[in-house]
Amino acid sequence: MAQPDKYYNKYTYQMSPAMLRARRPYFWKNMGAFGILGGISLSVYLYTYNFLMQDDFENIPIPPIKDEDLAALRREYEEKKQLSK
């Protein structure tokens, strides 16, 4: 059976004053590390997003399609559209 934790109130699960005092010296260091790591992650994400939004895919050739195949695809699309309503 688990022992009750002396650093948390067993009814409210709030930290005890001793636990708060023990964590206090690390708070700003942890927030700084979080800010740095979060900033790096966000900057990589935004750089990638902006880089990908600049590409217009003009250099990718579109394969030719027959008119009959195009008509069949349009019919299939319209049927699925009607079924989803």
From Swiss-Prot:
Keywords: Membrane, Mitochondrion, Mitochondrion inner membrane, Transmembrane, Transmembrane helix. The chain crosses the membrane at residues 26-48. It is a single-pass membrane protein. It is found in: Mitochondrion inner membrane. GO terms for biological process: mitochondrial cytochrome c oxidase assembly. Component of 250-400 kDa complexes called cytochrome oxidase assembly intermediates or COA complexes. This is Cytochrome c oxidase assembly factor 3, mitochondrial. The lineage of its organism: Eukaryota, Fungi, Dikarya, Ascomycota, Saccharomycotina.
